[in-house]
């Protein structure tokens, strides 16, 4: 294994610990400079889980506490000359998940307690909102400096109960009450920074803080969290080379693998490409490209949303959404797509100015394969090892250029799940094949749609490109004819690889493949 040049902060989200421990820190302090130069005061930022929000919040805390020594060599060191120490109140709401009303109130009180030890507690301050207001005012009076309030993962107590109407209303009232003093505390506040995954529109921080700037979809802040390609190829270049050595890849090949697996996040109309920092850091540290972020768990609220809205896997990447869809509170959503975007399972692929709509899609292979594997038991075999076995064996046959063996394996698999295919229509058949071929993207390149359209599946192997066209109660000959008539092979004629056309017909009466034809391109 090649030696790792950098120390990677796996599991560390505190700016102080990263800097003092000499861990790799990707400098995001230019964004703090931007906030201060623009005199921005109330800011909201939405990003997916484990995407660097907490680290940025911690960086802000250290800055406003005047911790000059932690910022040596960073962008902000050239800007800041005074390093004023402000009283900072940092509330981490990620610890308030899965709570009932009574437990949530207790949690808020415990969050306030350390600050009351610093600045005292006023008589009659019983409820969390009263206590918050009191400590901010006393801090201002005692220090002579306005306060900074940082609320990280503000929506964490609410997301897991978003589909529990009564519980949601109770917890929302508690949180609304807690955040309510922020507006009237304006004269005592220097800066307020709030992070979360989504936007609960009826919470007071949005309904009352009319000067709250939501920077989540601004181009200039698209890379405020996560790691850009420029950042990867500068501060992490030696370790990309080391990872390539470990995987038997050149530097450019390794960079491409990382891009395909972890890059592709876009958070605005003209966003930079952003890598998932959680996965990228673990890949560098462990010198292996694995499913780190997706494998760390799918939130229960997201699973419930997928069930509630009956999401079809083929629709996920085809429907557009508008800016208004992003602003809908989770409990008022009529589609799972905005929540899938906010949670990091979809990202912006394109912006269409004419309709002012956003085309969403999977950001990268890690998320695409993870989502398809999670959803496949609803359409294919409920036993995931059956599905994975089909995919790997099919690909093995293709590597051996044994297309007959691959098709016979697919036919046998479809026969084994024929009961799940009974009373299904052509759309269901298309979904089954969509899943099977896209799951192969974990191992080989599966083509996306091109300008001239696409065949049902295009599978790229090192020496051969296979183009599949599927028919439902038609004929394999018609499928081959469509490949020729539509010119599906044209984009690959200059590849230098062997081209193979495969026409397939699905027989609905037998509930499996009826026939197939194979011809060289």
Name these PLM-found stretches:
Residues 178-185, 338-346, 434-438, 442, ...:
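Metal-dependent nuclease catalytic cores in nucleic-acid-processing enzymes
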Residues 148, 464-466, 500:
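Structural motif
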Residues 168-173, 472-489:
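Mg2+/Mn2+-dependent nuclease catalytic core
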Residues 491, 497-521:
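Domain-level recognition of nuclease-like catalytic cores that cleave nucleotide substrates
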Residues 433, 455-472, 486:
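Conserved catalytic cores of phosphodiester-cleaving nucleases, focusing on short active-site segments
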Residues 1-425, 440:
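Phosphate-binding site recognition
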Residues 139-143, 436-462:
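Active-site metal-binding core of divalent-cation-utilizing nuclease and nuclease-like domains
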């Amino acid at each position: 294994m090649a030696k790792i040049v950098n120390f990677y902060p796996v599991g560390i989200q505190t700016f102080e610990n990263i800097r003092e421990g000499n861990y790799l820190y990707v400098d995001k302090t230019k964004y703090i400079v931007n906030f201060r130069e623009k005199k921005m005061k109330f800011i909201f930022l939405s990003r997916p889980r484990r995407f660097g929000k907490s680290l940025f919040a911690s960086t802000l805390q250290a800055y406003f506490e005047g911790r000059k020594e932690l910022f040596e060599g960073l962008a902000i060191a050239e800007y800041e000359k005074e390093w004023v120490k402000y009283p900072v109140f940092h509330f981490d709401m990620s610890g308030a998940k899965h709570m009932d009303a009574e437990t949530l109130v207790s949690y808020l009180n415990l969050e306030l307690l350390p600050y009351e030890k610093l600045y005292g507690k006023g008589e009659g301050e019983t409820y969390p909102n009263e206590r918050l207001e009191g400590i901010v005012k006393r801090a201002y009076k005692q220090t002579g400096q306005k306060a900074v309030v940082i609320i990280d993962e503000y929506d964490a107590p609410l997301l897991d109960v978003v589909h529990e109407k009564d519980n949601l209303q109770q917890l929302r009232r508690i949180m609304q009450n807690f955040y309510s003093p922020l507006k009237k505390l304006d004269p005592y506040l220097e800066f307020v920074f709030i992070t979360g995954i989504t936007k609960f529109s009826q919470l007071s921080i949005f309904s009352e803080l009319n000067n709250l700037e939501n920077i989540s979809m601004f181009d200039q802040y698209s890379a405020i969290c996560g790691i850009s390609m420029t950042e990867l190829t500068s501060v992490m270049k030696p370790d990309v080379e080391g990872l390539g050595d470990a995987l038997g890849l050149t530097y450019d090949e390794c960079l491409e693998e990382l891009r395909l697996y972890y890059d592709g996040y876009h958070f605005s109309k003209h966003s930079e490409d952003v890598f998932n920092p959680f996965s990228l850091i673990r890949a560098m540290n462990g010198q292996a490209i694995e499913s780190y972020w997706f494998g760390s768990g799918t939130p229960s609220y997201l699973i419930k949303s997928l069930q509630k809205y009956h999401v079809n896997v083929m629709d996920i990447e085809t429907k557009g959404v508008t800016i208004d869809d992003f602003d809908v509170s989770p409990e008022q959503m009529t589609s799972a797509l905005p929540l899938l975007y906010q949670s990091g399972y979809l990202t912006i692929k394109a912006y269409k100015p004419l309709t002012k709509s956003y085309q969403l899609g999977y950001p990268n292979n890690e998320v695409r394969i993870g989502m398809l594997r999670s959803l496949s038991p609803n359409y294919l075999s409920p036993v995931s090892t059956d599905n994975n076995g089909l995919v790997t064996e099919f690909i093995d046959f293709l590597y051996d250029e044994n297309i007959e063996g691959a098709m016979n394996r697919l036919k046998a698999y479809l026969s084994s799940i024929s009961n799940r295919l009974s009373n299904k229509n052509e759309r269901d058949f298309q979904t089954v094949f969509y899943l099977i071929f896209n799951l192969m993207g974990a191992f080989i390149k599966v083509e996306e749609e091109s300008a001239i359209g696409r065949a049902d599946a295009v599978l790229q192997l090192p020496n051969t490109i296979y183009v599949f066209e599927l028919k439902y109660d038609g004929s394999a000959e018609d499928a081959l004819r469509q490949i020729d008539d539509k010119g599906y092979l044209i984009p690959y004629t200059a590849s230098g690889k062997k081209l193979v056309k495969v026409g397939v017909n699905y027989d609905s009466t037998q509930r499996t493949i009826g026939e197939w034809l194979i011809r060289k391109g």
